[in-house]
Regions:
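H-loop (His-switch) and adjacent beta-strand-loop-beta switch element
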Residues: 169-186
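ABC ATPase nucleotide-binding domains
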Residues: 191-224
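H-loop/switch region of ABC-family ATPase nucleotide-binding domains
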Residues: 156-157
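Catalytic Walker B motif of ABC-type/P-loop ATPase nucleotide-binding domains
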Residues: 120-124
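Conserved ABC ATPase signature
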Residues: 95-99
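Conserved ABC transporter NBD signature motif
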Residues: 17-25, 33-34
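Conserved ABC ATPase "signature" region
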Residues: 58, 73-91, 116
Length: 224
Protein backbone atom coordinates (compact mmCIF):
# COMPACT_ATOMS: atom_id res chain seq x y z
CA UNK A 1 0.00 0.00 0.00
CA UNK A 2 1.15 3.53 -0.88
CA UNK A 3 0.27 6.47 -3.10
CA UNK A 4 -0.24 6.21 -6.86
CA UNK A 5 3.39 6.79 -7.82
CA UNK A 6 4.94 4.27 -5.43
CA UNK A 7 5.37 1.60 -8.16
CA UNK A 8 3.31 -1.00 -6.30
CA UNK A 9 2.54 -3.00 -9.43
CA UNK A 10 6.23 -2.97 -10.40
CA UNK A 11 7.05 -4.56 -7.05
CA UNK A 12 4.97 -7.60 -8.02
CA UNK A 13 7.70 -8.51 -10.53
CA UNK A 14 11.08 -9.82 -9.34
CA UNK A 15 14.04 -7.59 -10.26
CA UNK A 16 16.80 -9.97 -9.19
CA UNK A 17 17.28 -13.42 -7.73
CA UNK A 18 14.70 -16.19 -8.02
CA UNK A 19 11.01 -16.31 -7.21
CA UNK A 20 9.74 -19.65 -5.89
CA UNK A 21 6.19 -21.01 -5.92
CA UNK A 22 5.64 -24.30 -4.09
CA UNK A 23 9.43 -24.87 -4.15
CA UNK A 24 9.61 -24.39 -7.93
CA UNK A 25 11.13 -21.40 -9.70
CA UNK A 26 8.66 -19.50 -11.84
CA UNK A 27 10.91 -20.03 -14.86
CA UNK A 28 10.52 -23.81 -14.52
CA UNK A 29 6.71 -23.68 -14.63
CA UNK A 30 4.68 -23.57 -17.82
CA UNK A 31 1.87 -21.04 -18.11
CA UNK A 32 -0.69 -23.78 -17.42
CA UNK A 33 1.22 -25.11 -14.40
CA UNK A 34 1.50 -21.58 -13.02
CA UNK A 35 -2.21 -20.95 -13.57
CA UNK A 36 -3.07 -24.13 -11.67
CA UNK A 37 -1.40 -22.72 -8.56
CA UNK A 38 -1.95 -18.99 -8.87
CA UNK A 39 -5.02 -16.87 -9.60
CA UNK A 40 -4.88 -13.24 -10.76
CA UNK A 41 -7.46 -10.49 -10.27
CA UNK A 42 -6.60 -7.31 -12.25
CA UNK A 43 -8.02 -3.81 -11.82
CA UNK A 44 -10.17 -4.41 -14.90
CA UNK A 45 -10.87 -7.71 -16.63
CA UNK A 46 -10.31 -6.50 -20.19
CA UNK A 47 -13.31 -8.55 -21.35
CA UNK A 48 -15.02 -6.69 -24.20
CA UNK A 49 -16.85 -9.46 -26.08
CA UNK A 50 -20.32 -10.51 -24.99
CA UNK A 51 -20.11 -13.41 -22.55
CA UNK A 52 -22.52 -14.60 -19.91
CA UNK A 53 -21.55 -14.17 -16.29
CA UNK A 54 -21.41 -17.96 -15.95
CA UNK A 55 -19.01 -18.29 -18.90
CA UNK A 56 -16.68 -15.72 -17.33
CA UNK A 57 -16.62 -17.58 -14.02
CA UNK A 58 -16.06 -20.92 -15.78
CA UNK A 59 -12.85 -19.47 -17.23
CA UNK A 60 -11.38 -20.16 -13.81
CA UNK A 61 -11.39 -23.88 -14.65
CA UNK A 62 -9.45 -23.44 -17.89
CA UNK A 63 -6.05 -24.61 -16.51
CA UNK A 64 -7.69 -27.84 -15.29
CA UNK A 65 -9.27 -28.74 -18.63
CA UNK A 66 -7.64 -30.26 -21.69
CA UNK A 67 -7.84 -28.61 -25.11
CA UNK A 68 -11.49 -28.22 -26.23
CA UNK A 69 -12.75 -30.03 -23.12
CA UNK A 70 -15.96 -28.37 -21.90
CA UNK A 71 -16.62 -27.67 -18.20
CA UNK A 72 -18.42 -30.49 -16.41
CA UNK A 73 -21.90 -30.23 -14.92
CA UNK A 74 -20.30 -30.26 -11.47
CA UNK A 75 -18.09 -27.31 -12.43
CA UNK A 76 -21.13 -25.37 -13.64
CA UNK A 77 -23.02 -26.02 -10.41
CA UNK A 78 -20.00 -24.98 -8.36
CA UNK A 79 -19.68 -21.80 -10.42
CA UNK A 80 -23.36 -20.97 -9.83
CA UNK A 81 -22.96 -21.63 -6.09
CA UNK A 82 -19.91 -19.35 -6.02
CA UNK A 83 -21.87 -16.57 -7.74
CA UNK A 84 -24.58 -16.92 -5.11
CA UNK A 85 -22.00 -16.85 -2.33
CA UNK A 86 -20.46 -13.57 -3.50
CA UNK A 87 -23.85 -11.90 -3.91
CA UNK A 88 -24.69 -12.43 -7.59
CA UNK A 89 -27.47 -15.04 -7.47
CA UNK A 90 -29.52 -15.68 -10.61
CA UNK A 91 -27.12 -13.62 -12.71
CA UNK A 92 -25.35 -16.47 -14.49
CA UNK A 93 -27.08 -15.86 -17.86
CA UNK A 94 -26.74 -12.07 -17.75
CA UNK A 95 -24.33 -10.36 -20.15
CA UNK A 96 -21.12 -9.70 -18.22
CA UNK A 97 -20.63 -6.33 -19.92
CA UNK A 98 -24.02 -5.15 -18.66
CA UNK A 99 -22.99 -5.52 -15.02
CA UNK A 100 -21.93 -2.56 -12.90
CA UNK A 101 -18.19 -2.17 -12.28
CA UNK A 102 -18.60 -3.52 -8.77
CA UNK A 103 -20.52 -6.56 -10.00
CA UNK A 104 -17.91 -7.18 -12.69
CA UNK A 105 -15.15 -7.23 -10.10
CA UNK A 106 -17.09 -9.66 -7.90
CA UNK A 107 -17.58 -11.86 -10.98
CA UNK A 108 -13.82 -11.88 -11.65
CA UNK A 109 -13.27 -12.73 -7.98
CA UNK A 110 -15.64 -15.68 -8.39
CA UNK A 111 -13.61 -16.76 -11.43
CA UNK A 112 -10.51 -16.93 -9.24
CA UNK A 113 -12.34 -18.72 -6.42
CA UNK A 114 -13.67 -21.64 -8.47
CA UNK A 115 -10.13 -22.73 -9.33
CA UNK A 116 -9.32 -23.03 -5.59
CA UNK A 117 -5.79 -21.70 -6.16
CA UNK A 118 -3.49 -21.50 -3.16
CA UNK A 119 -2.10 -18.10 -4.20
CA UNK A 120 -4.13 -15.12 -5.38
CA UNK A 121 -2.58 -11.91 -6.75
CA UNK A 122 -4.81 -8.84 -6.79
CA UNK A 123 -3.71 -5.57 -8.41
CA UNK A 124 -5.68 -2.68 -6.85
CA UNK A 125 -8.94 -4.64 -7.14
CA UNK A 126 -10.85 -1.96 -5.22
CA UNK A 127 -9.84 0.99 -7.42
CA UNK A 128 -13.17 1.25 -9.30
CA UNK A 129 -15.44 0.11 -6.46
CA UNK A 130 -17.66 2.05 -4.10
CA UNK A 131 -17.59 1.64 -0.32
CA UNK A 132 -20.05 -1.26 -0.23
CA UNK A 133 -18.47 -3.32 -3.01
CA UNK A 134 -14.88 -2.84 -1.85
CA UNK A 135 -15.67 -4.04 1.68
CA UNK A 136 -17.80 -6.88 0.34
CA UNK A 137 -15.00 -7.99 -1.99
CA UNK A 138 -12.35 -7.96 0.73
CA UNK A 139 -14.54 -9.91 3.15
CA UNK A 140 -15.17 -12.58 0.50
CA UNK A 141 -11.42 -12.71 -0.14
CA UNK A 142 -10.65 -13.16 3.55
CA UNK A 143 -13.26 -15.93 3.84
CA UNK A 144 -11.71 -17.74 0.86
CA UNK A 145 -8.17 -17.47 2.23
CA UNK A 146 -9.25 -18.89 5.60
CA UNK A 147 -11.35 -21.71 4.13
CA UNK A 148 -8.67 -22.88 1.66
CA UNK A 149 -5.55 -22.14 3.73
CA UNK A 150 -4.50 -19.88 0.88
CA UNK A 151 -2.49 -16.68 0.54
CA UNK A 152 -3.61 -13.44 -1.10
CA UNK A 153 -1.15 -10.72 -2.09
CA UNK A 154 -3.05 -7.47 -2.68
CA UNK A 155 -1.95 -3.99 -3.72
CA UNK A 156 -4.26 -1.38 -2.17
CA UNK A 157 -4.76 2.38 -2.01
CA UNK A 158 -7.11 2.42 0.99
CA UNK A 159 -5.20 2.16 4.31
CA UNK A 160 -8.35 1.75 6.43
CA UNK A 161 -9.53 -1.12 4.22
CA UNK A 162 -6.12 -2.77 4.49
CA UNK A 163 -5.93 -2.28 8.26
CA UNK A 164 -9.25 -4.05 8.77
CA UNK A 165 -8.92 -6.97 6.36
CA UNK A 166 -5.23 -7.86 5.94
CA UNK A 167 -2.99 -9.85 8.27
CA UNK A 168 0.18 -8.05 7.20
CA UNK A 169 0.70 -4.69 5.51
CA UNK A 170 3.83 -3.99 3.47
CA UNK A 171 4.24 -0.24 3.15
CA UNK A 172 6.09 1.21 0.15
CA UNK A 173 7.64 4.63 -0.32
CA UNK A 174 8.98 5.66 -3.73
CA UNK A 175 9.27 2.04 -4.78
CA UNK A 176 11.15 0.90 -1.67
CA UNK A 177 10.05 -1.03 1.41
CA UNK A 178 9.33 1.32 4.33
CA UNK A 179 8.11 -1.18 6.91
CA UNK A 180 5.48 -3.73 7.90
CA UNK A 181 2.32 -3.48 9.98
CA UNK A 182 0.46 -6.36 11.63
CA UNK A 183 -2.90 -4.73 12.49
CA UNK A 184 -3.72 -7.17 15.29
CA UNK A 185 -0.39 -6.82 17.09
CA UNK A 186 1.44 -3.65 16.02
CA UNK A 187 0.91 -0.85 18.58
CA UNK A 188 -1.29 1.98 17.30
CA UNK A 189 1.49 4.50 17.97
CA UNK A 190 3.85 2.58 15.68
CA UNK A 191 1.19 2.29 12.96
CA UNK A 192 0.56 6.03 13.16
CA UNK A 193 4.27 6.81 12.96
CA UNK A 194 4.86 4.63 9.90
CA UNK A 195 1.76 5.74 8.02
CA UNK A 196 2.34 9.41 8.91
CA UNK A 197 5.74 9.21 7.25
CA UNK A 198 4.06 8.59 3.89
CA UNK A 199 0.58 10.14 4.18
CA UNK A 200 1.27 13.17 6.36
CA UNK A 201 0.19 13.37 9.98
CA UNK A 202 -2.58 10.85 10.66
CA UNK A 203 -4.34 9.38 13.67
CA UNK A 204 -5.76 5.88 13.99
CA UNK A 205 -8.95 5.46 15.99
CA UNK A 206 -10.44 2.21 17.27
CA UNK A 207 -14.20 1.97 16.79
CA UNK A 208 -16.65 -0.83 17.57
CA UNK A 209 -19.68 -1.79 15.51
CA UNK A 210 -23.05 -2.87 16.92
CA UNK A 211 -21.77 -6.43 17.27
CA UNK A 212 -18.75 -5.35 19.28
CA UNK A 213 -16.24 -5.96 16.49
CA UNK A 214 -13.26 -3.61 16.53
CA UNK A 215 -12.35 -1.54 13.46
CA UNK A 216 -9.37 0.71 12.78
CA UNK A 217 -10.07 4.06 11.12
CA UNK A 218 -7.31 6.29 9.75
CA UNK A 219 -7.97 10.02 10.05
CA UNK A 220 -6.00 12.67 8.16
CA UNK A 221 -4.93 15.37 10.65
CA UNK A 222 -3.87 17.99 8.15
CA UNK A 223 -5.10 19.00 4.71
CA UNK A 224 -2.93 18.27 1.67
Amino acid sequence: MRQNYAFKSDCEHPHKGSCLLAENTLESLSARELAKQCGYIPQKSGITIDLTVLDVVLMGYHPDLSLLQPPTAQMKEHAKATLTMIGLPDREQKNYNQLSEGQKQLCILARAFVGTRKLLLLDEPESALDFRFRNQMMQHLRTYVTAHDACALVTLHDPSLALNTCDELIVLSNGTHSGNISPKSTPVSKMESLLSSIYGTINIAKLHDKNGNEHLVMIQEESI
